[in-house]
Structure formats: structure tokens, C-alpha cells
Regions:
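Compact, glycine/acidic-enriched structural inserts
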Residues: 76-117
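A surface-exposed partner-binding patch
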Residues: 1-82, 129-182
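Hydrophobic alpha-helical interaction segments
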Residues: 105-139
């Protein structure tokens, strides 16, 4: 019964674990690993809402679910350099970001042109990037929105999150810097 409950409550997390192609794409180039959910520092949300680390990246960054509930909760990303931002509303939206624009951390201008330049560089190293992306999306039953839509949504969420989603370094009571600025 417990495993069935986990699957119902976290269907996308379960799907990632069950589909090797999706997990591989998310691991690279997505730099997203479900086994790295522990953050390097003690942190909390300014609002006092629950914060649950559920994944991380190779550079020490962490993805957190904010508040109570399942995979539809807002997702905050905190890097290891003291910066954080709300990046998605729900795991489905985060996975679309990671599939469409896995280089989002380097795409600071939020333009399709900048994303295309980064994609070209990634494609040099991963010639079958588009095929792998499509397979991962199909395995997770996700649509792939247009790059412009994904980038606009990321900027909207990150810059419009408000004070409730400010991450605080608990030992010093100091806020993390915004990862994404207006």
C-alpha cells in the first residue's frame, strides 16, 4: 500500500525513476538528479512554509518543493553560491523547463536567440540531443512547449514570486540573493 501511495502522490518522480532514458536526459544535460535532494546549508522560506529538497545538481544546487502537497507545489531552486529563485509551479512545469531549456541557468538574457546559441554548443557534444529530449518527454508523458514560452514563464515566475518565496540562510537569518533578477 505504501508504494502505491507514493506512486499516486508522486507520479512524475516515480516515472523518472522507472524510465532510464528520461532519467539520463534529466541527469545530463538537465543536471537534475533525484538522489541529490540534500542542500548544503540549513535554510527556510521567509513565509515559514514547508520546504522539501527533492533533487539537486552536480554543482551543489537543490530543488525544493514549497508548501504542503504533492508534485503540484511551487519549485524553488537554490544554488551553492547563495542565490535562489522560484523556477516552476509544479514538477511538471520544472521538467518541461529542464527538457526544453536544460541550460536555463546560463540563459540569463531569457531570449530564444541566447537559448539557440547554447543549444548549438550542447548539440556539438550531444548530437542526438533533440531525439533524446523527445524520448524523455514521451516517457514522462510531457508536452514540449516552445522555447520562447518556457523562457517567458521562467522569468515571470522567478521575478514575480514575492517575499513568501525568499530563501533564508537559517543560521544567520540572511536572505539568499535572487538568482534571476528583473
Amino acid at each position: 500500500v505504501a508504494a502505491a501511495t507514493v506512486c499516486r502522490m508522486n507520479p512524475l518522480i516515480t516515472a523518472i525513476r522507472e524510465h532510464e532514458a528520461a532519467a539520463r536526459f534529466l541527469a545530463w544535460p538537465g543536471d537534475f538528479d533525484l538522489d541529490r535532494g540534500d542542500h548544503v546549508e540549513e535554510v527556510h522560506l521567509a513565509s515559514g512554509a514547508a520546504l522539501e529538497g527533492f533533487a539537486g545538481d552536480g554543482a551543489g544546487g537543490t530543488y525544493f518543493f514549497c508548501g504542503d502537497g504533492g508534485e503540484d507545489r511551487p519549485v524553488l531552486y537554490a544554488d551553492s553560491e547563495g542565490r535562489a529563485a522560484l523556477v516552476a509551479i509544479g514538477l511538471r512545469e520544472l521538467l518541461q523547463l529542464l527538457l526544453v531549456v536544460p541550460w536555463w541557468r546560463d540563459c540569463r538574457a531569457f531570449t530564444v536567440q541566447q537559448s539557440a546559441e547554447l543549444e548549438a554548443a550542447y548539440t556539438e557534444d550531444i548530437p542526438d540531443l533533440a531525439v533524446r529530449r523527445t524520448r524523455a518527454a514521451q516517457a514522462l508523458d510531457l508536452e514540449l512547449p516552445a522555447t520562447a514560452d518556457v523562457m517567458a514563464r521562467l522569468r515571470q515566475i522567478a521575478t514575480g514570486a514575492g517575499e513568501d518565496y525568499v530563501l533564508i540562510f537559517t543560521p544567520e537569518g540572511e536572505p539568499y540573493e535572487p538568482l534571476i533578477k528583473n
